Swiss-Prot record:
Its cofactor is [4Fe-4S] cluster. Specifically methylates position 2 of adenine 2503 in 23S rRNA and position 2 of adenine 37 in tRNAs. Residues 98-326 form the Radical SAM core domain. GO terms for biological process: rRNA base methylation; tRNA methylation. This is Probable dual-specificity RNA methyltransferase RlmN. Disulfide bonds join 105-341. It is an enzyme of class 2 (transferase). The active site is at 92 (proton acceptor), 341 (s-methylcysteine intermediate).
C-alpha cells in the first residue's frame, strides 16, 4: 500500500493517530515542531523522538511525495515550480515577492473541470483531487528552498488560486488551511490566506460556517448571466443570482470583505456597460466588496481572447470608483516566464508527448 504524506495530517489528526498507535500525546508536539519549525526532511532527523516512534512514522508515512521538475525564475523575483506527483501527474506552484512579504499560490487539483474558456488550467481536464499532504508539500518545498538560501525568509502569505477549483476539493483544502495556519507550526495568519472559488454556491455557505477567518475571493469575470455563462461554464449550474445569495449569506455571517476577481478581456467584458452592471451587482455589499481587475495573460490555445488595452482597463477602473466600488488593477508577476496559471504544466506535457511520439516513430522505424 502506498504511504501517505505526513503533511496531510492536521494537528488534531496527528495527535489522534499517534495516541491510537500507543504513543503519548506530547509526541505530536515534538513531531509537529520538527516538521514545521525545524523543517527536517527525514524522520531520522527528529533527534528527541524515540526510535520506536520514528519507525512507526517511517512505516506509515512519507515526507515528500513531490519531485521538482522545472523551476523558472523571473526578473521580478517570481519563481514558478513544476512538480511531479508520485503518480506521474504534474502540478504548478508559484512564489511571488510582494511589498508585504512572500506569497505562494498553490494548486489543489490535477487539471480543472470548471471550463473557463480563457484559462490555461482548464485545457487539461481534472483527473483527480490533490491530497491535503500534496497541497501542504507545495508550501514546504518553497519554504525549504528559502531555508536553503539562509536569508531567514519565510512564506508569509498563501493564495489558493492555482490549478483546480478549491471548493471542489473542499475537505482536503480545509485540512491544508488548518495545517499552515496552526500557531505551533508555520503559523501563517488566517488573514494572510485567500481561497478563490469560481462560484460553488453551497461551498461558499459551508466556508462561511468554518471556524477561521481565511479570506474569500470570487472569480466573477462578468456581471450578467449571459456573458458569464459564455466564458464560465459553471454559471449554468450556479447562476449569478444563486452566487449572490451565497455571498449575501457569507457577508452577513462573517462581516468579512470579499474580493471579486475580474479578468479583463478585450471587447468581451471590458466596456463601460459591464462596469456599470458590476457596480450595480455589488452595490448592496459595496462596503465589503473589493474588485481586483486582472490583465489577461494570453494563452496560445485561446486565440479568441486578447488583453484589454491599458486605456480600457483604466476607464473600467474609473467607472467602478465613481460608483463607489473599491477596486485595484492587479500588479503583474512573472511576465517573462510562463505566467498564466497552468501554462507551464501544459507546455511540459506537450513536450513529453512530442518526445514520446518521436520515440515511438523511431522504434517503429527500427523494427
Amino acid at each position: 500500500m502506498e504511504k501517505s504524506s505526513i503533511y496531510g495530517l492536521t494537528w488534531t489528526k496527528l495527535t489522534e493517530w499517534l495516541e491510537a498507535h500507543g504513543q503519548k500525546k506530547f509526541r505530536a508536539t515534538q513531531v509537529w515542531d520538527w516538521l514545521y519549525r525545524k523543517r527536517v526532511k527525514t524522520f531520522e532527523e527528529m533527534s528527541n523522538v524515540p526510535k520506536e516512534t520514528i519507525e512507526l512514522l517511517t512505516a506509515n508515512f512519507v515526507m515528500n511525495t513531490l519531485e521538482e521538475q522545472v523551476v523558472q525564475e523571473s526578473t521580478d523575483g517570481t519563481t514558478k515550480y513544476l512538480f511531479k506527483l508520485s503518480d506521474g501527474n504534474l502540478i504548478e506552484t508559484v512564489m511571488m515577492k510582494q511589498e508585504y512579504g512572500l506569497s505562494v499560490c498553490v494548486t489543489t487539483q490535477v487539471g480543472c473541470n470548471i471550463g473557463c474558456t480563457f484559462c490555461a488550467s482548464g485545457l487539461l481536464k481534472k483527473s483527480r483531487d490533490l491530497t491535503a499532504g500534496e497541497i501542504v508539500e507545495q508550501i514546504m518545498n518553497v519554504q525549504h528552498y528559502l531555508d536553503g538560501r539562509n536569508l531567514e525568509e519565510r512564506v508569509s502569505h498563501v493564495v489558493v488560486m492555482g490549478i483546480g477549483e478549491p471548493f471542489d476539493n473542499y475537505d482536503n483544502v480545509m485540512d491544508f488551511l488548518r495545517v499552515i495556519n496552526h500557531d505551533k507550526g508555520l503559523a501563517i495568519g488566517a488573514r494572510h490566506i485567500t481561497v478563490s472559488t469560481s462560484g460553488l454556491a453551497p461551498r461558499i455557505i459551508d466556508f462561511a460556517n468554518e471556524d477561521f477567518q481565511v479570506n474569500l475571493a470570487i472569480s466573477l469575470h462578468a456581471p450578467n448571466n449571459e456573458l458569464r455563462t459564455s466564458i464560465m461554464r459553471i454559471n449554468k449550474t450556479y447562476s449569478i443570482e444563486k452566487l449572490m445569495e451565497a455571498i449575501h449569506y457569507y457577508v452577513n455571517k462573517t462581516n468579512r470583505r470579499i474580493t471579486f476577481e475580474y479578468i479583463m478581456l478585450k471587447g468581451v467584458n471590458d466596456h463601460k456597460k459591464e462596469a456599470l452592471e458590476l457596480a450595480a451587482l455589488l452595490g448592496e455589499h459595496r462596503h465589503l466588496a473589493y474588485v481586483n481587475l486582472i490583465p489577461y495573460n494570453p494563452v496560445d490555445e485561446h486565440i479568441d481572447y486578447e488583453r484589454s488595452t491599458k486605456e480600457d482597463v483604466l476607464a473600467f477602473y474609473d467607472t467602478l470608483k465613481k460608483n463607489g466600488i473599491n477596486c485595484v488593477i492587479r500588479r503583474e508577476h512573472g511576465t517573462d516566464i510562463d505566467a498564466a496559471c497552468g501554462q507551464l504544466r501544459s507546455k511540459q506535457i506537450k513536450r513529453v508527448g512530442v518526445r514520446e511520439r518521436m520515440k515511438q516513430k523511431q522504434a517503429a522505424a527500427e523494427e
